[in-house]
Design a protein with these regions (language model features):
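N-terminal Rossmann-fold NAD(P) dinucleotide-binding loop
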Residues: 16-17
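C-terminal helical subdomain
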Residues: 67, 193, 217-258
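Conserved glycine-rich cofactor-binding loop
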Residues: 5, 12-13
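Conserved glycine-rich Rossmann-like NAD(P)H-binding loop of the short-chain dehydrogenase/reductase
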Residues: 26-42
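The beta1-alpha1 cofactor-binding region of Rossmann-like NAD(H)/NADP(H)-dependent oxidoreductases
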Residues: 37-38, 57-72
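A glycine-rich helix->loop->beta "capping" turn
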Residues: 49-53, 73-86, 92-97
Length: 268
C-alpha cells in the first residue's frame, strides 16, 4: 500500500476507524471524511503515532452540498486516488429531512456515496490509467432485502418505517455497485460491496425506540464482531493482490456471495 491513497468516509468511529488505522499501517495515505473535527484530529494523531500518514476533510455527508464540496476538495488535493471506501451510513429511528429536503437515511446511505463517487471519478480513472488499477468499495449490509418504493422514496406521503428505509438504502447501494462495476469493467477500476457482519459499535447504539434499544445491544453481545475484526474484509478488498481480480461482487468474510436477486436486476 506504500504510496497509495485511500479515501474513507465515516472514518472516525467503528468500522471506518478500524479500517483507516489498518490501511495506514500498511503504508497508505488515508484521507478521511467525517463531520466531527475533534475526532478526526484524534485519528490523525493515532495514525501518525504508528508512523502512518493521515489527513481529513470535515463534511456532513447527509448534505449534498457538503458531499460535493468534499469530493472537489479531495480531488484537488491528492495526486492519486487508489481506493475509495464508501463506509459512512446510519439508521435513523425517527423521520427527518435534511436542509435539502432529502430523508436522512436516503441522503446519507445512498445519495452521498453516489455523489461523492461521481466527484472523485476523474481522479480514480486517472489513477487507474497511470498505475494500472483502482478500487471502489461500498459498505452495504445483509439488510438490503426490501423492494424500493419509488412512489414514496422520500416518505413525503408519510408511513416512515426506519428499518424499511435502511433496507431500501442498502438495496440501492448494492444495485449501484453492480451497475458501476459493469460500466467501468474495461477501465482497470473494480467496484465491489461488502456485508461487514454485525459490528458491535453499531449495534450498541441506543437511539432505537423501545424495545429495540434494549434488544439490539443484547444481540450485539452474542453475534457482534469488534470493529478491528470486522475491518478484515474491507482491508483485504482494498489492499490484497487476491482481491484485485474481484469485480461486481457482494462480499462477506472475503467470499463472494449472492445478494438478494432484485439488487442484481439489470433492468430495474
Amino acid at each position: 500500500m506504500k504510496d497509495k491513497t485511500v479515501v474513507i468516509t465515516g472514518a472516525t468511529s467503528g468500522l471506518g476507524r478500524a479500517t483507516a488505522l489498518q490501511l495506514a499501517r500498511k503504508g497508505a495515505l488515508v484521507v478521511g471524511v467525517a463531520r466531527n473535527e475533534s475526532k478526526a484530529n484524534e485519528l490523525v494523531k493515532e495514525i501518525e503515532k504508528h508512523g502512518g500518514k493521515g489527513q481529513f476533510v470535515v463534511a456532513d455527508l447527509s448534505s449534498m452540498k457538503d458531499t460535493a464540496g468534499a469530493g472537489r476538495s479531495i480531488a484537488g488535493s491528492v495526486d492519486r486516488l487508489d481506493i475509495l471506501i464508501n463506509n459512512a451510513g446510519a439508521h435513523f429511528p425517527k423521520y427527518g429531512v435534511t436542509s435539502e429536503d432529502f430523508e436522512f437515511t436516503l441522503a446519507l446511505n445512498y445519495l452521498s456515496p453516489f455523489l461523492l463517487t461521481h466527484h472523485l471519478m476523474d481522479k480514480i480513472e486517472q489513477t487507474a490509467a497511470e498505475h494500472g488499477e483502482a478500487r471502489i468499495v461500498n459498505i452495504s449490509s445483509i439488510m438490503h432485502k426490501a423492494p424500493i418504493n419509488w412512489d414514496n422514496l422520500n416518505y413525503g406521503d408519510g408511513g416512515y418505517r426506519s428499518t424499511v428505509a435502511y433496507y431500501q438504502s442498502k438495496h440501492m447501494l448494492t444495485s449501484f455497485t453492480y451497475l458501476l462495476s459493469r460500466k467501468l469493467k474495461e477501465s482497470g477500476i473494480t467496484v465491489n460491496c461488502i456485508h461487514p457482519g454485525f459490528v458491535k459499535t453499531a449495534l450498541a447504539k441506543s437511539d432505537y425506540p423501545f424495545p429495540m434499544n434494549v434488544i439490539v445491544p443484547i444481540v450485539g453481545l452474542f453475534i457482534g464482531e469488534p470493529p478491528e475484526r470486522a475491518a478484515d474484509t474491507p482491508v483485504w478488498l482494498a489492499s490484497s493482490d487476491e482481491a484485485k481480480r474481484m469485480n461486481g461482487e457482494y462480499i462477506h468474510h472475503r467470499k463472494a456471495k449472492k445478494s438478494w436477486p432484485p439488487t442484481r436486476d439489470k433492468d430495474a
